[in-house]
A protein has these predicted regions:
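Aromatic-rich peripheral "rim/lid" segments of glycoside hydrolase catalytic domains that contact
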Residues: 20-101
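Glycoside hydrolase catalytic-domain groove-lining segments
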Residues: 1-16, 39
Length: 101
């Protein structure tokens, strides 16, 4: 589509909020990689945020819809991981090499 001049937008990607530090590290890795992939190929994207607080299935609260504040320190860390992936000096390979073990 893109090569033919057709605009592409990727919405509603995400990874549910996680309950422990190891799971949160993998969530941040996924979001960071996906955001960098999106930027690398010029496809605008947005994270899915349904406002459901907590951890587990269908829990995608990142930004409080009423106040505009982060929902939690973990949500802020996830969003910050995505923001850092937009830097021009960071490559997909860099993100991949720094995946949680």
């Amino acid at each position: 589509f893109i090569s033919k001049g057709v605009p592409v937008y990727l919405g509603e990607f995400g990874c549910v909020n996680r309950g422990n530090a190891r799971e949160q590290a993998f969530q941040q890795y996924y979001l960071k990689y996906f955001a960098k992939l999106s930027k690398t190929y010029g496809v605008p994207s947005i994270i899915w945020d349904n406002g459901a607080h907590g951890a587990g299935n269908e829990r995608h609260a990142f930004i409080d819809h009423g106040t505009g504040e982060y929902c939690s320190a973990e949500a802020k860390a996830a969003i910050q991981a995505m923001i850092t992936s937009y830097g021009n000096s960071l490559t997909l390979e860099d993100v991949y090499r720094n995946a949680p073990k």
